[in-house]
Amino acid sequence: MELYEVIQEIKKKKELNNISDKFVQKLVIKELEKRQYLLEIIKKAESIRDLKRNKEFLYFFKEIRKMLHEIYGVFAPKDIKKIWRILESDIPFEQKIIDILRMSRPTKERLNFYNEIYDNIFLEKPKKIIDIASGINPVSIYFSKDKPKSYFFVDISSDILMINEYVLEQMSIGSYGYEIDIFEPSKELFEFYQYIFLWKTIPIIEKYNPGYTKELISKLNFNYLIVSFSLQSLSGRRKLGRAWRPWMHRLAKDLGFKIQKEFETKNELFIIITP
């Protein structure tokens, strides 16, 4: 059977069905390179049902889903159709924004703090922003008293990009979404941006590609880079964010960057970096 069929089966899990096929395919191929024998098993199988009877394939299948959950699923809204129903409803625009932001864990956690966050991070009036691994966070710019002229965002779901573009258009903000895998970035990521957001993304990068954060940040072109870290693990049992602070300070020092400001909300540590 074809690898495409395996990819579609992986994406049948609701939280994963909005990820681009291309991203899932690259991840599957990368992991299969470590298990060449599985590729032969897939080619010879007549159906997904047959494949799932193979214990080694089933383990691989579950591991891929687990990785996608950690990279994307845990941060993404589960119901894209519901977001469009909200946008097409007659409720006030501000309520639409609130209802949408409640649909993903990171934005829901920030919901009561967005005014404070934007007041703290915009050391200069924003003009041009890019939000890397954005999810639906760009929608929250509604709560900033200063709106940028242009807002770009990067995600691995075209559905998420379309939602962000639609909502920002309603705010008269020029916007554009890039479907980019940050592990294999394209040139758009390295253009100049006044503000770059990299929120709750670094721990995932370092888990799956240790050392890549430094390589990525060294190539970014910005006035202000705002990174953030969750203060707790997903289970809420472990304190995490402050453990990343000295790590981030060392990375900034190694790259010749400066830490301009730090602040915390209830759930998140923010660090503002300048070249």
Regions found by a protein language model. Give the residues of each.
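Conserved Class I S-adenosyl-L-methionine-dependent methyltransferase catalytic core
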Residues: 43-124
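Conserved class I S-adenosyl-L-methionine
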Residues: 125-137
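Conserved SAM-binding loop of SAM-dependent methyltransferases across substrates and taxa
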Residues: 135-148
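Conserved SAM-binding motif I beta-strand of class I
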Residues: 150-155
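Conserved SAM/SAH-binding beta-strand->alpha-helix loop
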Residues: 157-159
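S-adenosyl-L-methionine
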Residues: 162-199, 205
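A short, conserved alpha-helix within the catalytic core of class I
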Residues: 204-217
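Conserved beta-strand signature within the Rossmann-like core of class I S-adenosyl-L-methionine
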Residues: 221-232
